[in-house]
């Protein structure tokens, strides 16, 4: 398992984490067996948005005696009414559901209290200015939440939330398909066939700005929908018309700026194993470029995907790293100190580029790498 620091929370989590909704139809014994397997393989981070009381109790039983082995991300505003899940902004219902979560998990706190599913700007304003944020802050002051997070599928809303300084963790949907789409407050557009009927080129700029802002400011992203609800794993369902592997989807998500972990939604032991395969996968197995390059309607032409195919550099420059740190400066009047320091620590810098062109011949996306190195050298001064 590769472990990463969860931004400014300081928490250390495995890059492959558990989204627990897939355990809903399992017995307590089956859930405990899956948790045994997860622990043996280094998984220490889980997300639980589901309000289903039986699922919560089964996960609590699986955690019994080993609560300390997990960083738990539990959701506020997810309640159980009339035998089904409901999203709410009612503070009393949200508090009662959160207290039910703690009781059923057998713990008195969660590391991350995730304000659940905020996709519309009006909803975000209600959350930030109303009783829900006050509730989250109160729970944090009481120690029942250690850090506040927010989940969203809309990059504009997510960016607005991140800029407030009120959240430390963002749960966001990341995969190469969604990254092409413009912002929307209707999550259903992410799955709609008509969204992909026209030509789409490069990562949507709102998403790129969100990822780079989070990287700069230490607001960490944990990822949902890395497989696009499973569609990206199927040639019949993928908008690309060709399947990706779980490892390729995970590699894509885990190489985006700001991302620390992926909450893999797994319904079987085989699916947990498929996600864990990322940890031991070869560079060839992680390589997602073959699934993305050469598509008729979809193009990432000229956009650095941080895939590393440009390597090896004749003088040893980490080209993907230089591009990432340069891109992090673009929206800033001054270079953030954290970005400047990360660039300084690179063993070789953009000014060392000899313009041999070897990297450009290797790049599957036609990036003007030599030009990017000149821009980075001018920006950073070396």
What is the predicted function of each stretch?
Residues 19-29, 76-95, 121, 125, ...:
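Active-site mouth loops of central-metabolism enzymes
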Residues 314-330, 361, 365-379:
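Iron-sulfur (Fe-S) cluster-binding segments and ferredoxin-like electron-carrier domains
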Residues 1-76, 135, 141:
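N-terminal binding-site loop/beta-alpha segment at the start of enzyme catalytic domains
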Residues 6, 18, 38, 46, ...:
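Conserved, mostly hydrophobic/aromatic
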Residues 100-124:
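Active-site groove signature of glycoside hydrolases
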Residues 26-38, 89-106, 152-160, 244-252:
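Short, acidic/polar
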């Amino acid at each position: 398992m590769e472990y990463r620091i969860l931004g400014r929370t300081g928490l250390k989590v495995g890059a492959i984490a558990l989204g627990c909704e897939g355990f809903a139809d399992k017995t307590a014994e089956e859930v405990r067996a899956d948790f045994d397997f997860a622990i043996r393989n280094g998984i220490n981070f889980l997300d639980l948005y589901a309000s289903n009381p039986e699922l919560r109790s089964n996960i609590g039983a699986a955690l019994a005696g080993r609560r300390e082995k997990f960083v738990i991300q539990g959701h506020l505003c997810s309640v159980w009414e009339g035998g089904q899940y409901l999203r709410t902004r009612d503070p009393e219902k949200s508090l009662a559901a959160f207290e039910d979560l703690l009781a059923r998990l057998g713990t008195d706190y969660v590391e991350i209290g995730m304000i659940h599913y905020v996709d519309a700007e009006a909803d975000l304003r209600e959350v930030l200015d109303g009783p829900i944020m006050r509730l989250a802050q109160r729970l944090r002051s009481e120690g029942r939440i250690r850090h506040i997070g927010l989940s969203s599928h809309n990059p504009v809303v997510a960016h607005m939330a991140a800029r407030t300084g009120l959240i430390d963790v963002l749960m966001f949907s990341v995969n190469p398909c969604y990254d092409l789409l413009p912002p929307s407050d209707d999550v259903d557009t992410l799955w709609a066939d008509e969204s992909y009927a026209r030509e789409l080129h490069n990562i949507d700029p709102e998403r790129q700005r969100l990822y780079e802002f989070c990287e700069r400011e230490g607001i960490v992203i944990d990822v949902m929908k890395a497989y696009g609800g499973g569609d990206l794993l199927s040639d019949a369902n993928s908008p690309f018309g060709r399947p990706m592997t779980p490892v390729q989807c995970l590699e894509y998500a885990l190489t985006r700026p700001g991302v620390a972990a992926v909450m893999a939604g797994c319904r079987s032991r085989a699916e947990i194993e498929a996600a864990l395969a990322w940890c031991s996968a070869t560079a060839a197995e992680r390589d997602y470029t073959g699934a993305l390059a050469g598509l008729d309607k979809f193009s990432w032409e000229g956009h650095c995907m941080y895939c590393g195919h440009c390597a090896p550099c004749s003088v040893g420059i980490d080209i993907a790293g230089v591009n990432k740190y340069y891109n992090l400066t673009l929206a800033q009047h001054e270079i953030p100190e954290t970005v400047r320091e990360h660039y300084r620590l690179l063993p070789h810098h953009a000014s060392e580029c000899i313009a041999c062109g070897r990297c450009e011949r290797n790049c599957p996306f036609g990036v003007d790498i030599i030009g990017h190195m000149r821009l980075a050298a001018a920006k950073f001064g070396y």
